[in-house]
């Protein structure tokens, strides 16, 4: 089966995007892994699928698959690429759309300056709903690792995140601790591990070890979770400039019970055709 695809990225977090609005695409975990393979496939951090809406209240359905073949709830950088894709492909003439995800409805908007703003929804802070095994709802909680005990803040942006503050992201043990935190038993659905360096109250540097993908150049939901964690701990004031290895995002959050708004770029790299294995 031959399908058309578009390669896109948001701050170096790269995606293969497939239009399934007219013809369904059968994406097994093996097929996703084959497409995402950087040596034998197209190569990407995540595969994004555009599907018809499931109700009249939304414009599209948005599905996200990690490079390991697993389907996940949310991807912030992907959401920006999603709205750029459907607009550029003529699938909608709306500059702001409502999109159904496994985590709920999001509302990305294409701005006149070419950047994309996404209402990422209200962050979930209740441990049971993240999910995070804890009998406390404290903002900062200890997490025991094999060689360290780290202080983390658990946040869900539709997908789970564990954010810790580090002195310097360049020297932080992202690979070692990230892999251990991702599969920590206190996170039964696994977790994205964020390493945040606070430069000042309006600026952070961030690295994220993503669940099912490893460290990426940028993580949109990770940036949102880091800013929520930093504001909750009294370290940051909205809006916050988030510096990643792939570029910068702006994250705004007014506090508990309000949505997080993420703004950043979305870039088309190339288009092609592939044969599904």
From Swiss-Prot:
It catalyses: (2S,6S)-2,6-diaminopimelate = meso-2,6-diaminopimelate. This is Diaminopimelate epimerase. One of its GO terms (molecular function) is diaminopimelate epimerase activity. Its EC number is 5.1.1.7. GO terms for biological process: lysine biosynthetic process via diaminopimelate. The record marks 161, 210 as: Could be important to modulate the pK values of the two catalytic cysteine residues. Catalyzes the stereoinversion of LL-2,6-diaminopimelate (L,L-DAP) to meso-diaminopimelate (meso-DAP), a precursor of L-lysine and an essential component of the bacterial peptidoglycan. It comes from Azoarcus sp. (strain BH72). InterPro entries: DAP_epimerase_AS, DAP_epimerase_DapF. Pathway: Amino-acid biosynthesis; L-lysine biosynthesis via DAP pathway; DL-2,6-diaminopimelate from LL-2,6-diaminopimelate: step 1/1. Keywords: Amino-acid biosynthesis, Cytoplasm, Isomerase, Lysine biosynthesis. Homodimer. One of its GO terms (cellular component) is cytosol. It is found in: Cytoplasm. It comes from the Bacteria. Pfam families: DAP_epimerase.
């Amino acid at each position: 089966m031959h399908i058309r695809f578009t390669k896109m990225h948001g701050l170096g977090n790269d995606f293969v995007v497939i239009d399934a609005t007219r013809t369904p695409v059968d994406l097994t975990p093996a097929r996703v892994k084959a497409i995402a393979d950087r040596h034998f496939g197209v190569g990407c951090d995540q595969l994004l699928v555009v599907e018809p809406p499931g109700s009249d209240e939304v414009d599209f359905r948005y599905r996200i698959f990690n490079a390991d073949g697993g389907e996940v709830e949310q991807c912030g950088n992907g959401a920006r690429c999603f709205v750029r894709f459907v607009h550029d492909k003529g699938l909608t003439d709306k500059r702001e759309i409502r999109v159904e995800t496994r985590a709920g409805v999001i509302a990305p908007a294409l701005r006149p300056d070419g950047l994309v703003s996404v209402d990422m929804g209200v962050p979930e802070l209740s441990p049971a709903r993240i999910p995070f095994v804890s009998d406390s709802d404290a903002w900062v909680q200890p997490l025991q690792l094999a060689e360290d005990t780290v202080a983390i803040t658990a946040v869900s942006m539709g997908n789970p995140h564990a954010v810790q503050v580090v002195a310097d992201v360049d020297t932080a043990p992202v690979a070692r601790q990230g892999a251990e935190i991702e599969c920590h038993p206190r996170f039964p659905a696994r977790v994205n591990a964020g390493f945040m360096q606070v430069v000042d109250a309006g600026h952070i540097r961030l690295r994220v070890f993503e669940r099912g993908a490893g460290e990426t150049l940028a993580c949109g939901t990770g940036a949102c979770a880091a800013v929520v964690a930093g504001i909750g701990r009294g370290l940051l004031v909205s809006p916050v400039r988030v510096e990643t290895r792939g570029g910068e995002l702006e994250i705004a959050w007014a506090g508990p019970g309000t949505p997080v708004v993420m703004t950043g770029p979305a870039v088309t790299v190339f288009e092609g055709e592939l044969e599904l294995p």
